[in-house]
């Protein structure tokens, strides 16, 4: 039995993506500048992981209903409250930020009273600690190093698999995606915490995967069509992979939509940022990383890529 691939678009689609190269570059530059300016003026809404706060360690007599507990504490109006199990499922860590020193003890007592009145558990409060912003700075540095390391590893991988020009194209696209993601996070006031660092790394991985698929087709078409110029080759390659690109982005967005709707407040920043990043990564793989290869369009470049 012959298996036919699922296609959303006709086989012979011929949309001239390269004709919009100048428009897409201008659009991306404008969005990047807006992101830079907004971040410079309004900064980020740093979560407890980076801004510091209070940590309450408590042991319960049974496993708690964490989603319900998050909902109850989230309605107290004291800002972000993070609940996590540690050790056993009966051990709970409650973290929240410090709005002011005057409200510190009041908020601690408010949390205790709310838990006691809303749940039938027995609570044994074991420790109350202050986590300073110094720890937050260390986490920011670690997150920045993680992103930088991923950039370098991706550059080396693309250089080995294709050619350094391709690595430069992907690097520009990734910087574009990260800037837009950070700008989106600042504009929407999403909590900047460890989960958003994971979201940015997820966006980087998705964007690279999309670009590599198009790059593979460009290399294949360079071998097949010796008389076509690089602009025609890139345009043909984007069109040939367009059905796959659309199917991938739809299925990924649907999976992420489930996280946004049912994942709860604990992963809200992660799921919303990844949703935006998937769209940005798809856009950059088509309109940034592929068209930018025309800057290196010469015969020597073509021969090097074909040999790989």
Swiss-Prot record:
Predominant location category: membrane
Transmembrane segments: 22-42, 140-160, 164-184, 194-214, 246-266, 272-292
Membrane topology: Multi-pass membrane protein
UniProt record, GO biological process: intracellular protein transmembrane transport; protein targeting; protein transport by the Sec complex
Any one GO molecular function term: protein-transporting ATPase activity
Matches recorded under SUPFAM superfamilies: Multidrug efflux transporter AcrB transmembrane domain
Domain of life: Bacteria
Record bears the keyword Transport: yes
Keywords, comma-separated and alphabetical: Cell inner membrane, Cell membrane, Membrane, Protein transport, Translocation, Transmembrane, Transmembrane helix, Transport
Protein's UniProt keywords contain rRNA processing: no
Assembly and oligomerization: Forms a complex with SecD. Part of the essential Sec protein translocation apparatus which comprises SecA, SecYEG and auxiliary proteins SecDF-YajC and YidC.
Protein name, per record: Protein translocase subunit SecF
